[in-house]
């Protein structure tokens, strides 16, 4: 099944709107968590070729799914008393229900940008960003022993004291 072509800006707009309405009743950590992840989404929009930006946005969306479940389950009974409380809680729940679908769409965008599945042992290692930078050394032997050529030419090898 082919995923629909959805712009990242639409995903951000929908989640921003639902988070704003959810903040009518859920404030503090709910707002900080969700708006921080939306800021990562803005970064992913601004840098269209960045694998790190879209990857961090995807990871943040997954994290906020769990955080929203915990936050809504703890505070729902105390805030959903009036009409405004029920509306805000409903929008937060709707945002939570849309996040797995958004994660699928963002993961598809992550793959289009050249990203890989982030479940591998060296995930926290060097970045996957590709640049035009090339090293000066063409051989790996020169990097392993930089003074090997000096000994072969009869020159004195510098010593560290």
Curated annotation (Swiss-Prot):
Expression sites by tissue: Ubiquitous but more abundant in kidney, testis and heart.
Subcellular location: Endoplasmic reticulum membrane; Golgi apparatus membrane; Cytoplasmic vesicle membrane
Positions bearing Phosphoserine: 127, 138
Region feature Interaction with AGTR1, mapped onto this chain: 110-122
Extracellular side: 1-26, 75-86
Free-text function comment from the UniProt entry: Appears to be a negative regulator of type-1 angiotensin II receptor-mediated signaling by regulating receptor internalization as well as mechanism of receptor desensitization such as phosphorylation. Also induces a decrease in angiotensin II-stimulated transcriptional activity. May play a role of negative regulator in cardiomyocyte hypertrophy induced by angiotensin II through an inhibition of p38 mitogen-activated protein kinase pathway.
The protein's name: Type-1 angiotensin II receptor-associated protein
Originating organism: Mus musculus (Mouse)
